[in-house]
UniProtKB/Swiss-Prot annotation:
It is an enzyme of class 2 (transferase). Belongs to the GST superfamily. Phi family. InterPro entries: Glutathione-S-Trfase_C-like (IPR010987), Glutathione-S-Trfase_C_sf (IPR036282), Glutathione_S-Trfase_N (IPR004045), GST_C (IPR004046), GST_Phi_C (IPR034347), Thioredoxin-like_sf (IPR036249). This is Glutathione S-transferase 3. Residues 89-219 form the GST C-terminal domain. The lineage of its organism: Eukaryota, Viridiplantae, Streptophyta, Embryophyta, Tracheophyta. One of its GO terms (cellular component) is protein-containing complex. One of its GO terms (molecular function) is glutathione binding. Keywords: Transferase. Glutathione binds at S12, P13, N14, H41, K42, Q54, I55, E67, S68. One of its GO terms (biological process) is response to herbicide. Homodimer.
């Protein structure tokens, strides 16, 4: 089988989300760089893959997909028998759907701006906007309080097994180790910390992070 092609930038949270699931499945894929700084995502060749001009896009043979969460659902379903089962029958289907939605509507809207401010802007030669960081760090802390209460009763988001709901959060352990949005954002929440560390220890996550141009970690704890 020809390798799948994932179009995007390695540091994009949405690209990392898909790369993590591809690695969990043990699938052969290549990242085809799309340079947002030069407007490559708005050029006709990329718009043919995603008419909205956003990364990522995935090409799997004749199948062309965009929207990272839809891509991940496709991968988890089409390649269900390969690698990690991300939609296990033993997981609570209701919890899985709830936490997929939570990631999309509560977690990502606050975590993604932090990734941009704390990781992407410095790599592009800019400085983080302190006001934006503080705003989203405060909101993310409130979201993580909800996670802490839930994870006090569950090892993973949908129960005792790692699922697609957990995989969709993959960039954030990298964020908190490389540039924590505020001191103790994870360390002060022991159940979130244990969940974070379980994700970060997974070989698929480590393989994904190895391809991300992260800045060196700070000396203080997340």
């Amino acid at each position: 089988m020809a390798p799948l092609k994932l179009y995007g930038m390695p540091l994009s949270p949405n690209v990392v989300r898909v790369a993590t699931v591809l690695n969990e499945k043990g699938l052969d894929f290549e990242i085809v760089p799309v340079d947002l700084t030069t407007g490559a995502h708005k050029q006709p060749d990329f718009l043919a893959l995603n008419p909205f001009g956003q990364i990522p896009a995935l090409v799997d043979g004749d199948e062309v997909l965009f929207e990272s969460r839809a891509i991940n659902r496709y991968i988890a379903s089409k390649y269900a028998s390969e690698g990690t089962d991300l939609l296990p029958a033993t997981a609570s289907a209701a919890k899985l759907e709830v936490w997929l939605e939570v990631e999309s509507h509560h977690f990502h809207p606050n975590a993604s701006p932090l990734v941009f401010q704390l990781l992407v802007r410095p790599l592009l030669g800019g400085a983080p906007d302190a006001a934006v960081v503080e705003k989203h760090a405060e909101q993310l802390a409130k979201v993580l309080d909800v996670y802490e209460a839930h994870l006090a009763r569950n090892k993973y988001l949908a129960g005792d097994e790692f699922t697609l709901a957990d995989a969709n959060h993959a960039l954030l352990p990298a964020l908190t180790s490389a540039r924590p949005p505020r001191p103790g954002c994870v360390a002060a929440r022991p159940h979130v910390k244990a969940w974070w560390e379980a994700i970060a220890a997974r070989p698929a996550f480590q393989k994904t992070v190895a391809a991300i141009p992260l800045p060196p970690p700070p000396s203080s704890s997340a």
